[in-house]
Amino acid sequence: MWNSLHMTQARRPLMLMILDGWGYREASEGNAILAAETPNLNSLLNEFPWCFLECSGEAVGLPEGQMGNSEVGHLNIGAGRVVYQDLTRINLSVRNGDFFENPVLLDAISNVKLNDSSLHLMGLVSYGGVHSYMTHLYALIKLARDKGLKKVYIHAFLDGRDVPPKAALADIRELDAFCKENGSARIATVQGRYYAMDRDKRWERSKLAYDALTLGVAPYTTSDAETAVSDAYARGETDEFVKPTVVTGSDGKPEAVVQDNDSIIFFNFRPDRARQLTWAFENDDFDGFPREKRPKVHYVCMAQYDETLDLPIAFPPEELENVLGEVLSKQGLVQLRIAETEKYAHVTFFLNGGQEKCYDGEDRCLIPSPKVATYDLKPEMSAYEVTDEVIRRIQSGKYDVIVLNFANMDMVGHTGIFEAAVQAVEAVDTCVGRIIEALKKAGGVALITADHGNAEQMENQHTGEPHTAHTSNPVRCIYAGKGEVKALENGKLSDLAPTLLDLLGVPKPEEMKGKSLILNE
């Protein structure tokens, strides 16, 4: 099929274009995708075959009903098989009791007992299931209780993106009540993920988070965690943006700070937003900001955050063999991965099965994301710069396969600001039109799809509040280009890699359990 066109002197690129957050929803209320002017995508949907792909729940290795996300989506896309996610693995471990015998977690507890020190549990206090899950925190609290620990402190990072913007007050109340019923754990600090979970090296944010944890110094102090959240709401801050707040005792001193010989368990399982704080604690060569204090701690990562750091991992990664990038490399094909900063890790690390390695023949291009506080201030983000560069790469004639991600619909969708999301959709549509035109001139074709939904639902239909989380809606996949493809059948994200290989005429490895979406009839 495609290989008959491909095996000429001039390479005709096959592109996988991932429009992050481009979900499908028929209802128009709060639907930024339907509200936007999208002549290019509309034209492609009318002209070329397309299908629906499932991108949430069991279709991507998550619990039934759990919304998808970018990490999960790109893992499944690259693997060509359903990849059972850390959330699913850890949930099962809690249910069957293995969690409470996990040797890495038990080592952290043994360190506390040996040194008569403290256990710090830090992470996102959320039922979102994207970066963490409340059940895992509760299991850690029970484990500490069962092992007789008395000094257990929780550093609560608040969500507001993968759940409603003001979900934290109820979650903190629930957590506080659970702590009182299950041992002696107490909440020591509260702050929004904007500070504690930055991933774009905005070190001034990470420093505020780190100082609250290690020095007990923060913009605000409070007598209890619930008051910290309600005071933040009174200041006009939603969960994501709650400024670091230290909980103090009756003596006015911090409830707890991280000290030498303490143990830390960072209970987030998704790596990208756990790295910066981990580097601040554990990287000897860290230069993001001056560390006034660097306690020597026993530091445990719930999952692998950075393979260059030799840290204990409670749930280490399961290696995936023969992912898309590896198969293309073995075939001697030249591939490009391109995205702006916000999604660069997704088209590289996650698409390669959660591995940092770069395959032979794999080029990578990172376009910096704009340095703005929130992306509603610049809905186009760096899409135009990404487009200029990818067109230049298409015209170079160097690449057989190009994987591109546009971050806009997801990142601007997370702000909950409808008008900005509409502008984001329109910016991406303009870019899609330019790229497809360049592909046509080069004799190339594209599969245009998404990893999950977001911008199609910007409003909570029950409360009228902004909807800032991903959705569980399906996404579309368009075959855009001339050729033999007449129809596509519905599938899931793990069918994309087999489809790309089918188009290239490359045999699918047996590890890939997905199917080609191409209907031959």
Swiss-Prot record:
Q: Which domain of life is it from?
A: Archaea
Instruction: Give the matching InterPro entries.
Output: Alkaline_phosphatase_core_sf (IPR017850), BPG-indep_PGM_N (IPR011258), Metalloenzyme (IPR006124), PGAM_B_sf (IPR036646), Pgm_bpd_ind (IPR005995)
What top-level class of enzyme does the UniProt entry assign? isomerase
Could you list the residue ranges forming a coiled coil in this record?
Answer: none
* Active-site residue numbers: 70 (phosphoserine intermediate)
Q: Describe cofactor binding as the record notes it.
A: Binds 2 manganese ions per subunit.
What NCBIfam families does the record point to?
pgm_bpd_ind
The record's PANTHER family line, in alphabetical order, gives: 2,3-BISPHOSPHOGLYCERATE-INDEPENDENT PHOSPHOGLYCERATE MUTASE
Put simply, this protein is called 2,3-bisphosphoglycerate-independent phosphoglycerate mutase 2
